[in-house]
Design a protein with these regions (language model features):
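Short active-site oxyanion
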Residues: 42-47, 131, 203-204
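Conserved core of the sugar-phosphate nucleotidyltransferase
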Residues: 80-83, 101, 110-200
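Hydrophobic helical membrane-anchoring modules
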Residues: 184, 198-220
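Short internal beta-strands
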Residues: 31, 46-50, 135
Length: 220
């Protein structure tokens, strides 16, 4: 089984320019994800997809990284991560190997736990056929897509269950999905088919999209 750690790093960010190469505790956000991926013994390859010239220069000679330059049509504010993954994996599989499992590690989540990821991966491996596991935390934003948990699976909060006691939101720390799942649902999430891992630590739930988020991470 070939397991890929996938790190997407677009050059231009509307709300926080050049965020992927901004340094947190002396280390760029993308390098935080790269270093974490290297600690995962079950990962066979680390892929970076980017259109950022500085990131390309930084990793093009790395023996640990499979670097893929992202085309312009997949490097806009409207580009979906799943489209980037699909496009990149086609190139990867032609050149290297087939893919069974994708672990998405976004540079915007610099704080991660190896223990938690191993737990999530073990749960993922016990699932059958089409499967995915993603990280969530208690919801504090009614504007985001909110979920509740039923029979261990995530379900989207709708009009009929808005008053559900425990509501969660995807926090972006990690996503795990097999390639069949991604090809079929075009997402790491599908109702009644995705297992959530609840992160209680505040730092693990930090997702850097704005200057305020970055300042919060610096204080952590």
């Amino acid at each position: 089984m070939n397991t890929i750690a996938f790190i997407p790093a677009r050059a231009n960010s509307k709300r926080l320019p050049k965020k992927n190469i901004k340094k947190l505790n002396g280390v760029s956000l993308i390098e935080h994800s790269v270093r974490f991926a290297k600690t995962l013994k079950f990962v066979d390859d680390i892929i970076i997809s980017t259109d950022d010239k500085k990131i390309i220069k930084l990793y093009k000679k790395s023996k640990f990284i499979k670097l893929f330059k992202r085309p312009k049509h997949l490097a806009t504010n409207k580009s979906e991560t799943i489209s980037v993954i699909t496009h990149t994996l086609k190139k990867y599989e032609k050149k290297f190997d087939t893919t069974d499992t994708v672990i998405l590690l976004q540079p915007t989540s610099p704080f991660r736990s190896n223990k938690v990821l191993r737990l999530a991966y073990n749960i993922y491996n016990k699932l059958k056929k089409t499967k995915s596991v993603i990280s969530v935390s208690k919801s504090n934003n009614s504007l985001k897509r909110n979920f509740y948990i039923k029979n261990k699976y995530l379900e989207l909060v709708g009009k009929k269950n808005k008053k559900h006691k425990n509501i969660y939101q995807v926090n972006g720390n990690f996503y795990i999905g097999n390639k069949n799942f991604l090809d079929k649902y075009k997402s790491f999430y599908y109702t009644k088919k995705t297992i959530p891992i609840i992160l209680k630590s505040g730092s693990l739930s930090i997702d850097i999209d704005t200057k305020e988020d970055f300042d919060k991470a610096r204080r952590t």
